[in-house]
């Protein structure tokens, strides 16, 4: 019975073991432990006094002028949103472009559909005036 339990535990462990990934697992554990350790150390060693000067924002060594709550024009957000959309498009299309010669015609058609959808969205935003500053 002890032999069976040993065999079961060995097979159970080998089911989850990924040979060759020990270094990656070690790196993953260390890269997770270092920031956690830094945050805990900061929490334990940081001074706890909250005076008025300590609560001021740092503005290049100068006293802050005016309030920090100002309104930005909504156009900044529209340009940022369009930038993010096309930046994500680049992230999706780069791996496709790298493996283009191996993927074949179907992948090319899928990429064309993806680009067409984004161009329709760009044309819609342009037609609605989202890209005009006036």
UniProtKB/Swiss-Prot annotation:
UniProt enzyme class: translocase
Pfam families assigned: Oxidored_q4
GO CC terms in record: NADH dehydrogenase complex; plasma membrane-derived thylakoid membrane
GO biological process, one term: photosynthesis, light reaction
Primary localisation category: membrane
Residue ranges crossing the lipid bilayer per the database entry: 20-40, 78-98, 103-123
Record EC number: 7.1.1.-
Record keywords: Membrane, NAD, NADP, Plastoquinone, Quinone, Thylakoid, Translocase, Transmembrane, Transmembrane helix, Transport
Subcellular location: Cellular thylakoid membrane
Function (record text): NDH-1 shuttles electrons from an unknown electron donor, via FMN and iron-sulfur (Fe-S) centers, to quinones in the respiratory and/or the photosynthetic chain. The immediate electron acceptor for the enzyme in this species is believed to be plastoquinone. Couples the redox reaction to proton translocation, and thus conserves the redox energy in a proton gradient. Cyanobacterial NDH-1 also plays a role in inorganic carbon-concentration.
Family (UniProt): Belongs to the complex I subunit 3 family.
Subunit architecture: NDH-1 can be composed of about 15 different subunits; different subcomplexes with different compositions have been identified which probably have different functions.
Protein name: NAD(P)H-quinone oxidoreductase subunit 3
